[in-house]
Amino acid sequence: MFHHRGGCTPRAQTPYAANVPIVAEQQQFQQQIDQTANAMGNFQLNDNAYSFTQPAQQPQQPSSRKVANQLYPVDLFTELPPPIRDLSLPPPPITISQDSIVTPSETSNVPYQYVRSTLNAVPKTSSLLKKTKLPFGIVIRPYLNLQDSSEYVPLNNDGIIVRCRRCRSYLNPFVAFIEQGRRWQCNICRFKNDVPFGFDQNLQGAPINRYERNEIKHSVMEYLAPIEYSVREPPPSTYVFILDVSQNAVRNGLLATSARTILENLESLPNHDGRTSVSIICVDHALHYFYVPLDDDYEESDDDDDEDDDDEEEDNEEEEEEEEDEEDDDDSITEAIQMFDVGDLSEPFLPMPSEELVVPLRYCKKNLEKLLKTIPEVFQDTHISKFALGPALKAASYLISNTGGKIEVISSTLPDTGVGKLKRRAEQGVLNTTKESSQLLSCQDSFYKTFTIECSKMQITVDMFLASEEYMDVATLSHLSRFSGGQTHFYPGFNATSLNDVTKFTRELSKHLSMDISMEAVMRVRGSTGLRATSFFGHFFNRSSDLCAFSTMPRDQSYLFEISIEDSLVAEHCYLQVSTLLTLNTGERRIRVMTLALPTTESGREVYASADQLAITDFITQNAVAKALNSSMDSARDLITKSLQDILSAYKKEISMSNITAVTSLNLCANLRMLPLLMNALGKHIAFRPGMVPSDYRASSLNKLETEPLHYLIKSIYPTVYSLHDIPDEVGLLDSNRETKLPDPINATASLFERYGLYLIDNSTELFLWVGGDAVPELLNDVFNTDNISNVPVGKSELPVLIDSPFNVRLRNIISKIRENNDTITFQSLYTIRGPSINEPANLTAEREMASLRLWVSSTLVEDKILNCASYREYLQSMKTAINR
């Protein structure tokens, strides 16, 4: 046992373009639109609008004309069931004339996975934008993978960073070299700058071709930032773990589970520069700090460095002595660890200097492992139910106030002691009323707002892992992450006796801890003259009108910035450049630059034809989340409905009025035909749907929508449904690319469910396996090794492993493929649900559980009328009625 001191009141070498297909997906988009065009009439598309010229050695000759995306109107009522394959299509192509690019190539414009605009043709005037009622914003994802080594972005390390003297934008593929190449004209503000000395030379002074430079060829690239981009030496990555050791956390197994998970992942913490540091604070009604000494073998190796070996015999003698001492190593190390209790929560203080309590992982790893093994034993018999989170947060901030870092809170108890103490809010009579947002989704204590301001000053991020069967006030606690660049993860009903609960928690915490991070990051968007970023959505601290600050920048979040047109755009193209200054765990200061070029237009038809329905969905979602948190749930729902209604009305007025069928149909362009479906589904999402939704669940869902990368957000709004009982022979097996082939999805409606069928539903957070109540014994045997549906396990459980059943193997392959990801920490638990059957045995307890699960599944079938929300057909009819008034 440790001493208890009481009394203290190389990156992967693949260019990103290879990982981010562009041309093939644009061709896919063209083919999809062509199918619609053929159905509507003999429309023709120009191939040049949908592909770039192959990379050239020298700048191309000016293009003589500009080709725009074509608009194809559709009647939404003839598009039933909706063609959900559109949800997997890339956005409408961005048509940039070749003469506006220094060296045209597939990497000249930013891939949409990094920066995605709601409009791929920008109105030249604010009045035209208002006429269309379409929103203008960009979805930003600075990193695409949890580990930086999985993503190659070109790096300039020659110290030459070329920026415009007027607007401070960075040199990019869309500038113009003028005056025999001695100067360059900024594409953002049109200012003429001098080309710096050394621009056409390498580090050795040898001449190079400037058209081969990264900033000329690539719209996504990085600079190694010189010293003037830093205000101090790069800090080490520092993690402070606040562990809940109250009775509830011990009883449900969270303490033991989290301690073991942290122990197993100490080696996985980002530690590229060998400077990563760790501290642990255990919290109940007091604060328990730990002094962790250097590992014995580190001390011995230090001594050995100062000594010369006399001969091999002496070495052998020393090794024998070390072996004799090995039996005592565990006891000696554990005894050297000391715990200090601080019970004065009004003014929590550090019992030792912070450098004694925050220890280098490199030199203390073994002792940290000893400590993490011991902590569950020390508190296993506790009867203390209190949890002083507020004082613990203040103490953790004292520990790392000089370096910044991450505070990882793992808790199972509502904070009820000291500053920031919370109480259970009365939900009865408030849920599903106009008071829901103000009384249940607001921050209960101002401490959680003011503390994040201090965190931003000290470069500290707070992540929350809340796992409990009790009320946790996620709405209040999520403020800690929302404004510090972190995330709140919620595990309702967690209990370590459930293997599935433990699996999900440990998988997600492990991926979170191993995820690369950036420190002391700031992000800014610069736009062409006339464009300005005005609203910002995501988890960060908005330090000024256009500067977003991240104490640490994670790899699994995205952000959305609204863009306003403040002056008319006179040029044929406009530009948005996202620059992020950050410090990597390697100790390097980097600047990541992403430049997006967009055509401008005076045609409303072109604006509609180039609108991105998925990015628009994200835009409306972020604004609805803000409404729900800052106003009311009704105002959030009204925003969703009105946003779509305005777009449909404007489209009818500006585009469809010449069509005689405009009154009897509901028209929209083909590239936006999924938008009504997504808005109908968004209103049924747990974050927004009316009904008695527990506030913790509502707050957690709103929090997740704020940061979810776009493809996961779309799946959480419109779940992917697979029919499994009739999959083709090749599905569930490896294809020619050694990837497991997934079945084609079907529409999310119960009308397609057969009573004997087997279906898998993926909502990005969970997986649901629906077993039809009349499933045949052969199917049940192949999947579950039973021919009686009553014996099929229901609830949270994995499929049995039946190696003698090829069908079972294929289904498990499909589930594994869906869970396979390297861009999110989410691990999707599998829930098995039996459909109703006339032979279902009467069991009141089982019936209640089954009814709850069936209701949950029905909420994912978003094309149906569910939970007092209109079906998709009814929704379209209501929209048609509204715009024809």
Swiss-Prot record:
Sorted alphabetically, the Gene Ontology cellular component annotations on this record are: COPII vesicle coat; endoplasmic reticulum exit site; endoplasmic reticulum membrane; Golgi membrane
Residue numbers spanned by region Zinc finger-like: 164-189
Query: Which GO terms are recorded in the biological process aspect for this UniProt protein?
Result: COPII-coated vesicle cargo loading; intracellular protein transport
**A UniProt-annotated Pfam family:** Sec23_trunk
Molecular function (GO) terms listed? SNARE binding; zinc ion binding
Tell me the superkingdom of the source: Eukaryota
Chief location category: cytoplasm
Q: Looking at the record, which segments are called Disordered?
A: 296-332
Q: Name the InterPro entries on file.
A: ADF-H/Gelsolin-like_dom_sf (IPR029006), Gelsolin-like_dom (IPR007123), Gelsolin-like_dom_sf (IPR036180), Sec23/24_helical_dom (IPR006900), Sec23/24_helical_dom_sf (IPR036175), Sec23/24_trunk_dom (IPR006896), Sec23_24_beta_S (IPR012990), SEC23_SEC24_subfamily (IPR050550)
Q: Which UniProt keywords apply?
A: Cytoplasm, Cytoplasmic vesicle, Endoplasmic reticulum, ER-Golgi transport, Golgi apparatus, Membrane, Metal-binding, Protein transport, Transport, Zinc
Q: Where in the cell is it found?
A: Cytoplasm; Cytoplasmic vesicle, COPII-coated vesicle membrane; Endoplasmic reticulum membrane; Golgi apparatus membrane
The residues that hold Zn(2+) are 164, 167, 186, 189
Q: Which residues cross the membrane?
A: none
* Signal peptide (residue range): none
Q: How would you describe this protein's topology in the membrane?
A: Peripheral membrane protein
Q: How does it assemble?
A: The COPII coat is composed of at least 5 proteins: the SEC23/24 complex, the SEC13/31 complex, and the protein SAR1. Golgi apparatus membrane; Peripheral membrane protein; Cytoplasmic side.
* Similarity annotation: Belongs to the SEC23/SEC24 family. SEC24 subfamily.
Q: What does this protein do?
A: Component of the coat protein complex II (COPII) which promotes the formation of transport vesicles from the endoplasmic reticulum (ER). The coat has two main functions, the physical deformation of the endoplasmic reticulum membrane into vesicles and the selection of cargo molecules.
Q: What is this protein called?
A: Protein transport protein SEC24-1
Query: Which source organism does the UniProt entry give?
Result: Saccharomyces uvarum (strain ATCC 76518 / CBS 7001 / CLIB 283 / NBRC 10550 / MCYC 623 / NCYC 2669 / NRRL Y-11845)
